C-alpha cells in the first residue's frame, strides 16, 4: 500500500521517461486524476485512460509524449514540493514561476487541482503539490 500517491505517480512518470516507455500506469485517485488533467492540458502527456480491469485498484494509464527521432521526453523533470511531513502553502501573489515560466507548478486549491497560471488568473492560493518542467 502506498501512503503518498502523488509521490508514487511522480516517480513512476520519471522512471518511465528515463527508459522512454510509451505508457505508464498510476494509481487512480482524485488528486492523481487532477494532476493528469493538468499535464494533458499543458501538453506534457498525450492521453489519459481509466482502467478498472486491474485487480481491486483502478488505474490511470498515461501516454507519455516524446519529440524527435531520439525520443526526447517533453517532461524534463518532476519535483514533489509539498510532502506529508512538510506541507507548503502559498497565496496567489506568492505562487512561484517555475524556470521563469517555462515549467508549471500544480496546486491543490479550493477550486480543485490547478496549474500556477490558472490559480493566478482566478486569484486563488493553495498547497503546491509539484513542479514540472
UniProtKB/Swiss-Prot annotation:
Organism: Mesostigma viride
HAMAP family: Ribosomal_uS8_B (MF_01302_B)
InterPro entries for this protein: Ribosomal_uS8, Ribosomal_uS8_CS, Ribosomal_uS8_sf
Task of the protein: One of the primary rRNA binding proteins, it binds directly to 16S rRNA central domain where it helps coordinate assembly of the platform of the 30S subunit.
GO cellular component: chloroplast; ribonucleoprotein complex; ribosome
The keyword Transcription regulation appears for this protein: no
Gene3D superfamilies (UniProt xref): 3.30.1370.30, 3.30.1490.10
GO molecular function annotation: rRNA binding; structural constituent of ribosome
Top-level taxon in the UniProt lineage: Eukaryota
Protein name: Small ribosomal subunit protein uS8c
Keywords: Chloroplast, Plastid, Ribonucleoprotein, Ribosomal protein, RNA-binding, rRNA-binding
Disulfide cross-links: none
Compartments, as annotated in UniProt: Plastid, Chloroplast
Quaternary structure note: Part of the 30S ribosomal subunit.
One GO-annotated biological process of the protein: translation
Family from the record: Belongs to the universal ribosomal protein uS8 family.
SUPFAM superfamilies in the record: Ribosomal protein S8
PROSITE patterns, per database record: RIBOSOMAL_S8 (PS00053)
Amino acid at each position: 500500500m502506498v501512503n503518498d500517491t502523488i509521490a508514487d505517480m511522480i516517480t513512476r512518470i520519471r522512471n518511465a521517461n528515463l527508459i522512454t516507455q510509451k505508457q505508464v500506469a498510476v494509481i487512480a485517485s482524485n488528486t492523481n486524476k487532477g494532476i493528469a488533467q493538468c499535464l494533458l492540458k499543458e501538453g506534457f502527456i498525450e492521453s489519459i485512460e481509466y482502467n478498472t480491469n486491474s485487480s481491486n485498484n483502478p488505474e490511470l494509464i498515461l501516454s507519455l509524449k516524446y519529440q524527435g527521432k531520439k525520443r526526447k521526453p517533453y517532461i524534463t523533470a518532476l519535483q514533489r514540493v509539498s510532502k506529508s511531513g512538510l506541507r507548503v502553502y502559498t497565496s496567489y501573489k506568492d505562487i512561484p514561476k517555475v524556470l521563469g515560466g517555462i515549467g508549471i507548478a500544480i496546486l491543490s486549491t479550493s477550486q480543485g487541482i490547478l496549474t500556477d497560471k490558472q490559480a493566478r488568473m482566478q486569484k486563488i492560493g493553495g498547497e503546491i503539490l509539484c513542479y514540472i518542467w
